[in-house]
Amino acid sequence: DQTALYIRMLGDVRVRSRAGFETERRGSHPYIDFRIFHAQSEIEASVSARNIRRLLSFQRYLRSSRFFRGATVCRSLNILDEDYNGQAKCMLEKVGNWNFDIFLFDRLTNGNSLVSLTFHLFSLHGLIEYFHLDMVKLRRFLVMIQEDYHSQNPYHNAVHAADVTQAMHCYLKEPKLANSVTPWDILLSLIAAATHDLDHPGVNQPFLIKTNHYLATLYKNTSVLENHHWRSAVGLLRESGLFSHLPLESRHEMEAQIGALILATDISRQNEYLSLFRSHLDKGDLHLDDGRHRHLVLQMALKCADICNPCRNWELSKQWSEKVTEEFFHQGDIEKKYHLGVSPLCDRQTESIANIQIGFMTYLQEPLFTEWARFSDTRLSQTMLGHVGLNKASWKGLQRQQPSSEDASAAFELNSQLLTQENRLS
């Protein structure tokens, strides 16, 4: 009951509050690595390619007990005392509304939007009861996920993950999916949405490849980030023990299907998935009682959720556009500083938010959401396409106010073609 849950979590807090216990963080931490990288350059006039590879390893060693991973004292108390009261609780009652303001919700939950929202969705969909989940293990699992996102990233952080998870929930509510998905499908979809950018370093795949990063070597330059997100998610699933009561075969199947969902978010493979999806729609042979077809639709839903920012209202969409562009430009600044060759769309001197967004909507987003609307011709689909049109018009208005905007737009047409192959921060 609630009293027992409180006592168990309070016990965790007391253990973590012992003197000498250091909050740990798994995986890469670009802010620290780049800070070391920058400090080194102050001493050395030039940095060799070998030093670049060494300093951008992103590896950190763990010093604390594996058992106590997942929550600091203050964060746990926030979860207990603040997440589900007042305005935050009122917002969760409208979590299926497409105008859900994830930025406001993140402020109301004191930076715990991913934990609060995902836990609520697990409860809303009846997953806790259906799969007999331990609520304390679930909390710990979600906190570990949230902590493995880098808050220093302007875009690829826990708030983005929460936004994608909320969008995925909206798609799961669409009539065609709601009438066909199983609790298993919902479980995998929500976990994949919450972890789809787990431990994102804030740079894109070409950056990792040209610096000979160990992840690029490990995954042979193929879906490097997506493979890392998936493997990181599997690590947390196993570490949390959330599904330890399920048969081993079921756990392996879960890990594989979550991987297939996350790997589908690789933007360089968009044409592959989009062509397959379009082919099924053209033939009219998409049968949602077939598990394989249903899984393809869930892959497309996650792809849509991942890049749905231009489908939100202008106030929300503009904030996301500014954040993702700042992350692009931050990478470009690093590439300039160390003479690595600036990646397409990452040069703040030649690119603009308006040009990047117009190109992204034209070449990547509109084709995807047009096909999704063919599959699910609902009010939500029309709302999303309507927002895309309005937001695109707004960016074009801002573009006309910029000097040399026509030249920049022409340059973007080439860059956007490169984007489909390598550059969107998947």
Curated annotation (Swiss-Prot):
Highest taxon in the source lineage: Eukaryota
Principal location listed in the UniProt entry: cytoplasm
A single MF term (Gene Ontology): cyclic-nucleotide phosphodiesterase activity
Annotated a divalent metal cation 1 binding sites: 160, 196-197, 306
Cofactor(s) demanded: a divalent metal cation
Gene3D superfamilies named among the record's database cross-references: 3'5'-cyclic nucleotide phosphodiesterase, catalytic domain
UniProtKB keywords: cAMP, Cytoplasm, Hydrolase, Metal-binding
Cellular localization per UniProt: Cytoplasm, Cytosol
InterPro entries associated with the record: HD/PDEase_dom, PDEase, PDEase_catalytic_dom, PDEase_catalytic_dom_sf, PDEase_CS
First-tier enzyme category under EC: hydrolase
Entry-linked Pfam families: PDEase_I
Entry keyword annotation includes Zinc: no
Domain PDEase: 80-402
Keyword check for Nucleotide-binding: no
SUPFAM superfamilies tied to this protein: HD-domain/PDEase-like
Catalytic residue positions: 156 (proton donor)
Cellular component, GO annotation: cytosol
Signal peptide region: none
Cofactor detail note: Binds 2 divalent metal cations per subunit. Site 1 may preferentially bind zinc ions, while site 2 has a preference for magnesium and/or manganese ions.
Pathway: Purine metabolism; 3',5'-cyclic AMP degradation; AMP from 3',5'-cyclic AMP: step 1/1
Enzyme Commission number: 3.1.4.53
Domain notes: Composed of a C-terminal catalytic domain containing two putative divalent metal sites and an N-terminal regulatory domain.
Function according to Swiss-Prot or TrEMBL: Hydrolyzes the second messenger cAMP, which is a key regulator of many important physiological processes. May have a role in muscle signal transduction.
Quaternary context: Interacts with CBFA2T3.
Record family assignment: Belongs to the cyclic nucleotide phosphodiesterase family. PDE7 subfamily.
Name of the protein in its database record: High affinity 3',5'-cyclic-AMP phosphodiesterase 7A
Organism: Rattus norvegicus
Gene name tied to this protein: Pde7a
